[in-house]
Amino acid sequence: MRESGILMPVSSLPGPYGIGCFGKAAFQFVDFLSAAGQTIWQLLPLSPTGYGDSPYQSCSAFAGNPYFVDLEALEKEGLLTAADLKAESWGKDPLEVDYGTLYVSRFAVLRKAYAAWRSQCAGLHGCAYYYPDDYYAFTLANEDWLEDYALYMALKVANKMKNWVEWDAPYRRRDKAVLAAFAAANEEEIGFWKFVQYKFSVQWQAVKTYANKKGVQILGDIPIYVSADSVDAWVGGKLFELDADGRFARVAGCPPDYFSADGQLWGNPLYDWAYHKKTGYAWWIQRVRHALGIYDLLRIDHFRGFDTYWAIPATSTTARTGKWENGPGMELFDALEAALGKLPIIAEDLGELFPSVRKLLADSTFPGMKVLQFAFGGGDNEYLPHNHVKNGVVYPGTHDNTTLTDWWENGASKKEKATAAAYLHLTPCKPTAKEVAAVKTAAARTALLRAALGSVADRAIIPMYDWLGLGAEAHLNTPGKLGGNWAWRAKAGFDSKALAAQIEAECAVYCRCNADVQNVKELAI
């Protein structure tokens, strides 16, 4: 079935409290998607943001982002007052997330809500605290990660948010007696982090249930690696490559290439795949099972790393000293499917790939990705629409690309613009520089959007900012840039009925509309 969807981070939704959340704007966006005939809402990872405010460098592979908890819902529950919300600063620009301000204000308000909640639960049924039944159900269902996460975050707070490798040895090495004593002395702080995850889960499941009832699937995102400064790394031990002192032996990155003479040193700990194999890939089964409870479809980032990955000594200052190692290949995905059934995975397979990576993708039968901004460098490029395949997902650009408007005006080379203009029939087949310069940005953007929608690929995902025609101000992430990423927010009212009708009409031309919407249109003719 041909279908289409929109990439829109939760953080980019409008709202009064500094960042998008699971409030009314999320439900309104689902209504917008449904009206536009869309069947997929693609998100960035919903995990807590970490280094550089990136959702791909999180403190947990399982926890949800506290920033996304809807504060107005907590107010309706009597856990916050209007005065509590007005007392905090939420940033100066409603179109940009100010993460520094948000870090202070959000947690201050969430702690007030937690205090009110504990007060409500105090003394019930003869207990010091008797929490709601669904809270106990949540903590029981998620105890395999929640207990460690809450303890880890309480320890982070006690250690002034330092990386766990800088903690005192008994905490760093997880001395059972020391951790038990800390947990007993810090029950309220540990409870706070559980409370936030409980509210995150309840609110998100309400949004997801509403979306599914409207015929909208949620496409989530799973980074392949965990952050070095994460509860997963602190607890994981043998899951990762360790040296004799129990520290990470090697870390992840990319080799030197045309774009970077030193390569990219990401710093994420590498998995000890031999150990994972011994466990039957239990941790990965746990991780994917958890993700399937949050999302309907899963995009797996850096899919090539399951075939071959670049391993760099942890002491290196550049990626030059790394070498290629073999990943688990199909053995991992066979184990996942044996435990979880057919996997609704989309593989992020971008970049230069070894033949073995392409074979892994083919063997897995997962759809790969095609990105139009990569298509026009010359020759019979694999990203050109005529080279797409049915079992695939086409994008004008991903979150790492700039917007189509900015790409056409500033990012594309002269050769790329000339190639694209000819390919998209915006100019003669061999255009002059003057003919290319005469192509209007709006015309180029529309042609690129239609090229994506017209692709043979079963799915087309268009970033929201490209439907809106926004420029560089909406560029979500520039790889390698420190600060200023992940900040774009949409204006209130961006999801208008007029735009929904326009999107529905464009998608209907290429038979990508929600079947119910398309059937109604056909009956009306």
Model-flagged regions — what are they?
Residues 1-37:
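Mature N-terminal, pre-catalytic/accessory segment of carbohydrate-active enzymes
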Residues 9, 18, 53-197, 201, ...:
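Alpha-amylase-like alpha-glycosidases and glucanotransferases acting on alpha-linked glucans and related
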Residues 24-49, 294-295, 452:
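Catalytic domains of carbohydrate-active enzymes, especially glycoside hydrolases
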Residues 34, 204-212, 337, 361-362:
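Surface-exposed amphipathic alpha-helices with a cationic face
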Residues 44, 217-219, 223, 297, ...:
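Outer-envelope exported proteins of Gram-negative bacteria
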Residues 193-226:
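Conserved, well-ordered alpha-helix/loop/beta-strand core segments that scaffold catalytic motifs
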Residues 469-524:
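Structured C-terminal cap/extension of enzyme domains
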